[in-house]
Amino acid sequence: MMDRKQTAETLLTLSPAEVANLKEGINFFRNKTTGKEYILYKEKDHLKACKNLCKHQGGLFMKDIEDLDGRSVKCTKHNWKLDVSTMKYINPPGSFCQDELVIEMDENNGLSLVELNPPNPWDSDPRSPEELAFGEVQITYLTHACMDLKLGDKRMVFDPWLIGPAFARGWWLLHEPPSDWLERLCKADLIYISHMHSDHLSYPTLKQLSQRRPDIPIYVGDTERPVFWNLDQSGVGLTNINVVPFGIWQQVDKSLRFMILMDGVHPEMDTCIIVEYKGHKILNTVDCTRPNGGRLPEKVALMMSDFAGGASGFPMTFSGGKFTEEWKAQFIKAERRKLLNYKAQLVKDLQPRIYCPFAGYFVESHPSDKYIKETNTKNDPNQLNNLIRKNSDVVTWTPRPGAVLDLGRMLKDPTDSKGIVEPPEGTKIYKDSWDFGPYLEILNSAVRDEIFCHSSWIKEYFTWAGFKNYNLVVRMIETDEDFSPFPGGYDYLVDFLDLSFPKERPSREHPYEEIHSRVDVIRYVVKNGLLWDDLYIGFQTRLLRDPDIYHHLFWNHFQIKLPLTPPNWKSFLMHCD
């Protein structure tokens, strides 16, 4: 069978009026063009959807008159029952899970049901697992999301962030990487970088690597915004970046192949990967919220995923209204618990032989971010692993820098004392110094840039950014380290309805946001045309909004959709007043 590129297919659309008329519980729909049937389940603000097609023998479901809770449907062929609230079959129990469809809402509150096609691309050209020799497949944890995989005589590395900060100056490594990390990277046959966030695509790390091996093969997914969109400007001399389509096996040698999958159903930014060696699959979902639209291979040899939470400025950087310290603490506690339970349930459903929580080992270590560090609590990987073991037979691994998992040993006998070799006694596990100076000086250099001697940079920048025709007024305030107004800094309004820069807020009714930004970071971002993730995910802002509404189109534009080339400041300086 020929491999074909994975694409997203819209199965059903509902108008805003149809969405507003959805009743609590079960709703049946038919696509009049295709004749296909679908089920939507509504519980307050939460929606779930699936095909109206029984997994047993393809029968249609109808309302189950015996169901008093309004959650289950019954197949017209053999009376199989599906609980649509959980997407699990309850008669016979423990038989199947129904595949969920992805629900996408547009800005007008219309709805689309979307499915990836093919949904399970890893099933193309299936291979039976072969027995692994001891030492044949070894996984070494380096730090955060970086793993060093020995796969026969090949070496593959995931997401190398080994030095410097991520998100401007907001994230720093929690774990001390092994001292030979650069030698390990240089020996790799290939590197996978999941997405463009700087805790995965670390230009300081790659700069050191490129000085030794500029031609090292690096593989990324074919995302809407290229992963290496900023490579030329970064000054990092990598020459062998390979962009591969989603859902197609990439053959490395006769025993080793990998497949990159998208997050959700639209390949804007995030990806995940399946690595297969001699029929044994390693699934790395990285930071994906809904990897491959929620369809993932079951019973893989090893699964790894994020777990920690806290990768957002919400709610720590917000103030006003409900955003009291008590509210923030309760919200964070509830969100971390939800994430923990979701990850535990996902692992229980997928039943990998081994599970490893990673990609969450960062810390807000700069002294100016003490408040964020204390407020932004993270999930404990051991707590997640305990929860997984309590509810399943999955073997778990909480990694420490330099620890090595021998997959052949662990698959044969999970109790083998040599299956996981911990780092030697006395190995430094946690970082206690981060060399802030050089990285902060790079940011600080932007503060003194000639661009900012001319107030017309504001119009130049936001015209370049290209976001307009949206009823939102934003006040941008440059601040010092402590978020007090920066002496001589800029404080201005942007009206995105007509992209004007008024002296006062307009008289019409309008949503309003105040964004207080550390001057070194906002000016560095503006000068270099960088995405606002450095500001928001990096905790470099303090925000106030009235009303308390998340403006998705605004934030999505500045976090993902800015132009690929920076503003032409050279031309600006030649022509500005």
Curated annotation (Swiss-Prot):
Its cofactor is [2Fe-2S] cluster. Binds 1 [2Fe-2S] cluster per subunit. Disruption phenotype: Mice do not synthesize N-glycolylneuraminic acid (Neu5Gc). Pfam families: Lactamase_B_3, Rieske. Expressed in all tissues tested, except in brain. It is found in: Cytoplasm. Keywords: 2Fe-2S, Cytoplasm, Electron transport, Endoplasmic reticulum, Iron, Iron-sulfur, Metal-binding, Oxidoreductase, Transport. InterPro entries: CMP-Neu5Ac_hydroxylase_Rieske (IPR037339), Cnh (IPR027033), RibonucZ/Hydroxyglut_hydro (IPR036866), Rieske_2Fe-2S (IPR017941), Rieske_2Fe-2S_sf (IPR036922). It catalyses: CMP-N-acetyl-beta-neuraminate + 2 Fe(II)-[cytochrome b5] + O2 + 2 H(+) = CMP-N-glycoloyl-beta-neuraminate + 2 Fe(III)-[cytochrome b5] + H2O. Residues 14-112 form the Rieske domain. Its EC number is 1.14.18.2. The keyword Glycosyltransferase does not apply. GO terms for molecular function: 2 iron, 2 sulfur cluster binding; CMP-N-acetylneuraminate monooxygenase activity; metal ion binding. Pathway: Amino-sugar metabolism; N-acetylneuraminate metabolism. The keyword Cytoplasm applies. Residues 1-4 form a propeptide. [2Fe-2S] cluster binds at C54, H56, C75, H78. Belongs to the CMP-Neu5Ac hydroxylase family. Sialic acids are components of carbohydrate chains of glycoconjugates and are involved in cell-cell recognition and cell-pathogen interactions. Catalyzes the conversion of CMP-N-acetylneuraminic acid (CMP-Neu5Ac) into its hydroxylated derivative CMP-N-glycolylneuraminic acid (CMP-Neu5Gc), a sialic acid abundantly expressed at the surface of many cells. This is Cytidine monophosphate-N-acetylneuraminic acid hydroxylase. It comes from Mus musculus (Mouse). The lineage of its organism: Eukaryota, Metazoa, Chordata, Craniata, Vertebrata.
